[in-house]
Amino acid sequence: MGHRGKRKPLPAEPIAAHIESFAHDGKGIAHVDGRVVFVDGALPGEDVTFVYTEIKRDYAAGRVVEIVTASPDRVPARCRHFALCGGCSLQYLSEDAQIALKEDLLLDQFRRIGKVEPAAQFPPLRGPHWGYRSRARLGARYVAKKGRELVGFREHASAKIVDMTDCPVLHPALGERIQAFAELIEGLSLRERLPQIEAAVGEERTALVFRVLEDPTAEDFARLARFGKDQGLDVYIQREGRDSVAPVYPETAHDLSYSLPEWEVTFRFGPLDFTQVNMAINRQMIDQVMQALDPQPEERVLDLFCGLGNFTLPLARRAGHVTGVEGGAEAVARAIRNAADNGIGNVEFHVADLSKPESCGSWAGREYHKVLLDPSRSGALEILQCVPNWKAGRIVYVSCNPSTLARDAGILVHEYGYRLLKAGVMDMFPHTAHVESIAVFER
């Protein structure tokens, strides 16, 4: 019988290495014994010792044991939970160096994947590095060995929940209440049947949706309602899918909201609706998109992956007509209500699966002066086949994944004759390697 499936034990002794550069996820890259090693916790230019966490034929992974020679960009991590928590990965890197890393990653992806280069770069959009995150999914677990409830993010590469008391990157309405959330759940009968909390902060209200795997008791409901009242929070429970979300306190559900005063728009949204997590950057991002697209009163604009209208409604304040398209019917219904609430009539919205252009409606065959794309991480590959129909002179692409942006940029440039005029990063997620970016194409 063979020994297939048996793994050699990883070397236990720390190994010396010089860190040469960054990987796309913010890990340091070194070469040891002819193999690329991705070292978690290491910065370019540093001499470190590390231990292996994984060894494959072509590459390996490891984590830092000791920083022998530190980078001048290294700073002390502010959060006491940083070493364990998977919510952040770059707190030990200075703020300026984080921005530079993201700019380098974006340009590298353009060159390697899209074989394109922007003619110019936008200055990076920057905002608060702490207390910025207004939406989060927090894990919850009662740990019998500890005799208490844990609430927070997962540990690095683990399903375990970090034993945390606070979180400095979360909005204070959430980050300063982590311990209070844990104490609340600890007192519920279903504490072992409550795996997560969806939390969302609006300008006037903060909402918590407790995911429960069994129905709460009358005493549980009373505790949840009392907590909501005492803390000034909207409290919901979710037994199954989104349709099962029900208010506990207040007894009637209330929308959350955020406003864009410059564009005279206020958005209302539910606690499970998708919104950008960083409202300061969101406002700057909208301003930058408006400047880049420069919609005119006589122009028709197409806004794809429009969500609840985050870009659509500001665009409609300047353009002649805006068509918004989104895959989720609930988001489109919300966008229609937001347009009506803001007295905006020069818009239309459609529900369409943008990964299946053949099923899209008549809007996909129309001509538009300008187009905005804001897809998910998978990018806009499929819908790009409709680009010739639109005959747009300018396309602005907002991306949360530089690799799919680079792929799609290559298509726009090499297949459809656009020029990549300008690109830049937006620091939507400080202290992480997540890169939010914008690119402007013209022909």
Swiss-Prot record:
Function text: Catalyzes the formation of 5-methyl-uridine at position 1939 (m5U1939) in 23S rRNA.
Residue ranges of every copy of the TRAM domain listed in the record: 8-66
Residues noted as binding [4Fe-4S] cluster in the record, renumbered to the chain: C79, C85, C88, C167
Family to which this protein belongs: Belongs to the class I-like SAM-binding methyltransferase superfamily. RNA M5U methyltransferase family. RlmD subfamily.
NCBIfam families xrefs: PRK13168.1, rumA
Catalytic-site annotation from UniProt: C400 (nucleophile)
Reactions accelerated catalytically: uridine(1939) in 23S rRNA + S-adenosyl-L-methionine = 5-methyluridine(1939) in 23S rRNA + S-adenosyl-L-homocysteine + H(+)
Molecular function terms from GO: 4 iron, 4 sulfur cluster binding; iron ion binding; RNA binding; rRNA (uridine-C5-)-methyltransferase activity
Source organism, top-level taxon: Bacteria
Protein name per Swiss-Prot or TrEMBL: 23S rRNA (uracil(1939)-C(5))-methyltransferase RlmD
Record's keyword terms, sorted: 4Fe-4S, Iron, Iron-sulfur, Metal-binding, Methyltransferase, rRNA processing, S-adenosyl-L-methionine, Transferase
